[in-house]
Amino acid sequence: MRLVSPLIDYLFASGKMKQVGSYEGSYTKSVYMPFTSNALIGTSYYMAPDTILNSKNNEITAIEVVDNVTNSVAPTVPATDPLSTTQAKQGYFYFCNMKRDVIASVPLYSLIRRLNAGKVQFCNFDDPIVWQNCFIQFDSLATAITTSHSVWLRVTYSPVEN
């Protein structure tokens, strides 16, 4: 124990390690993005501003898409239907910084937890993410996405220590 304690103290002090519990729970937020018109190819659908998910307050650590099958057994039901896996295959989520530079793009389909062996997609970016600059874009619409659909994201975050 004498050997481990100084190492743990060093990692905490240098900010390379944080004390955390489960990656889900009190720091997980559901975000719903309903479509006000039918989705179009190449149109950027930006996230609404959110004080909790703003990178100045919190760091986004994980993200997942809740699809219609997962929602069928979930206790929370949004006003519109979450995307199906077929619809999710057509789009991408873009993580952006303060300058709206794209830091990463991830297929929506790969963010569906039940199709990813039950694992959520973890995030770790050097450049802070600005939630309202992030967007979703579709490169195909073989399966229509209408006003009866929405993108349901579950975002896990960690408070930024000041």
PLM feature spans:
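Beta-strand-centric surfaces of beta-sandwich/beta-rich domains
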Residues: 1-162
